[in-house]
């Protein structure tokens, strides 16, 4: 694999020499940083099993190497990357996999280690969505996830990735993560804080990542991280699990932040060792039981992961002074809900008791039941999935609901050829050789729902959202 030139400040190299365990070679560290990062993907088990995914993609000649800490994760090598970007493959467009760096799969593995099965989870810094979607898959779309993102521009990307992967148990918020300890005290069974950091571990992906690096900025970032972990710890229920992670390598932003929390709440913080998380985890194990992953250990990004348990309650923070405002949705009455369920089922959309129908004007939404306890305590950017808009003739079913709820085994499902599926993703109407009988047609490709079409004569009218329409070369190789 080709080398690339990474910029290293002298002070950074000095700091790394001091931070690196004697069991590791500094020369190996420098050599690893100069190698471009291996591509990796995670199979979305909400839509397809790992075995079926491997069978589906076998004809492509992809080389898939299992990632030790994530059963559904693989390093991937492809001969046709220049001809067809991974993000333009049919399997990516339909949400069968997520392009995710291997080491960033570690925090969620730690969160669910030792049979942990939380019902309400918060992802404090969630965009672009790799870990939120991984959490949702581990929860099998059950329970509830609060996915927060401080950056307004990244909330849209977060929602797009959640929708593509067919996730239905998520509420999105847009706040500084430091508000949650006061706003939602002891509300979560598990919390992932993948903290904003100096990014020292990402030089293999971005050779200029350290251009603005300084020891002073590390100190400033660590101060923010302490405030974030303190807030997250207050939002965690007693007995709950907190995973703290970064993609940086200095101790100030990693071990020191966790040790500060333990010093602050000595009777409430228990470190849970990660040495048995996967075979070979001991190579990155610190004396505290954390994983400090230097890039040469597993040939991945530099990363840090700590897992801890809240053993008892701690004094509450002052209640927030802001007003949430009136919640604009009302629950749908049982009788009407039954009619909506019946109409949805006729086009292949079904859901279970983990979701409940709510209405706002002519909009119908499905919210995860597990998030209802948070209503009135925090303002949501987006909650659950938009099911439909009502109109005089019935319901206008929404694309995100089709991707999250549709069963490809529905009698009205219509499987497209590769050429017709590509037309669909380009936003064009489809003219199949033999038109289906039903007026509302669940469109599938590779036995996966990719949208809902209206049959008009021999034409299937495209309803693919304009913002998702793709140009350029797609999976059939035609531009």
Curated annotation (Swiss-Prot):
Gene3D superfamilies: 3.10.450.720, Vaccinia Virus protein VP39
Subcellular location: Cytoplasm
Primary location: cytoplasm
Pfam families with a match to the protein in the record: Methyltr_RsmB-F, Methyltr_RsmF_N, Methyltranf_PUA, YebU_pre-PUA_dom
Binding site residues for S-adenosyl-L-methionine: 125-131, 149, 176, 194
Keyword Cytoplasm assigned: yes
Gene Ontology molecular-function annotations: RNA binding; rRNA (cytosine-C5-)-methyltransferase activity
Annotated GO CC locations: cytoplasm
Reaction(s) catalysed by this chain's protein: cytidine(1407) in 16S rRNA + S-adenosyl-L-methionine = 5-methylcytidine(1407) in 16S rRNA + S-adenosyl-L-homocysteine + H(+)
Keyword Protein biosynthesis assigned: no
Family matches, as NCBIfam families: nop2p, PRK11933.1
UniProt name for this protein: Ribosomal RNA small subunit methyltransferase F
């Amino acid at each position: 694999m080709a080398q690339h030139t990474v910029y290293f400040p002298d002070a950074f190299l000095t700091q790394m020499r001091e931070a690196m365990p004697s069991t590791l070679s500094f020369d190996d560290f420098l050599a690893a940083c100069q190698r471009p990062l291996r591509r990796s993907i995670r199979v979305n088990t909400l839509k397809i099993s790992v075995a079926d995914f491997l069978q589906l993609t076998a004809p492509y000649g992809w080389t898939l190497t299992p990632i030790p800490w994530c059963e559904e994760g693989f390093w991937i090598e492809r001969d046709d990357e220049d001809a067809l970007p991974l993000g333009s493959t049919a399997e990516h467009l339909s949400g069968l996999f997520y392009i995710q760096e291997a080491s960033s799969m570690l925090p969620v593995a730690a969160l669910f280690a030792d049979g942990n099965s939380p019902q309400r989870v918060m992802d404090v810094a969630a965009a672009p969505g790799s870990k939120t979607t991984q959490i949702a898959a581990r929860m099998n779309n059950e329970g509830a996830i609060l996915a927060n993102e401080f950056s307004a521009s990244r909330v849209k990307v977060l929602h797009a990735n959640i929708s593509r992967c067919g996730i239905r148990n998520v509420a999105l918020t847009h706040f500084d993560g430091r508000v949650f300890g006061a706003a939602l005290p002891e509300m979560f069974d598990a919390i992932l804080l993948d903290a904003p950091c100096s990014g020292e571990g990402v030089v293999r992906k971005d050779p200029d990542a350290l251009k603005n690096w300084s020891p002073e900025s590390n100190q400033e970032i660590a101060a923010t991280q302490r405030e974030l972990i303190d807030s997250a710890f207050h939002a965690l229920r007693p007995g709950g699990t907190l995973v703290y992670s970064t993609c940086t390598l200095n101790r100030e932003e990693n071990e020191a932040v966790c040790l500060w929390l333990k010093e602050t709440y000595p009777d409430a913080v228990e470190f849970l060792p990660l040495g048995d998380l996967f075979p070979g985890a001991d190579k990155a194990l610190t004396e505290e039981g954390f994983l400090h992953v230097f890039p040469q250990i597993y040939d991945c990004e530099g990363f840090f992961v700590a897992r801890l348990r809240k053993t008892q309650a701690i004094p509450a923070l002052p209640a927030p002074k802001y007003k949430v405002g009136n919640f604009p949705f009302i629950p749908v009455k049982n009788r009407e809900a039954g009619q909506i369920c019946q109409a949805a089922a006729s086009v292949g959309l079904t859901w279970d008791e983990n979701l409940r129908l709510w209405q706002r004007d002519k909009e119908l939404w499905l919210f995860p039941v597990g998030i209802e306890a948070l209503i009135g305590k925090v303002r949501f950017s987006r909650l659950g999935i938009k099911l439909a808009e009502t109109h005089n003739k019935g319901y206008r079913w929404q694309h995100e609901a089709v991707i999250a709820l549709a069963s490809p085994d529905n009698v009205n499902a219509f499987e497209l050829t590769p050429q017709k599926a590509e037309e669909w993703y380009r936003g064009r109407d489809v003219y199949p050789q033999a038109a289906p009988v039903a007026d509302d047609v669940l469109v599938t490709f590779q036995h996966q729902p990719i949208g809902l079409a209206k049959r008009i004569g021999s034409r299937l009218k495209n309803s693919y959202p304009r913002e998702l329409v793709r140009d350029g070369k797609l999976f059939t190789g035609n531009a």
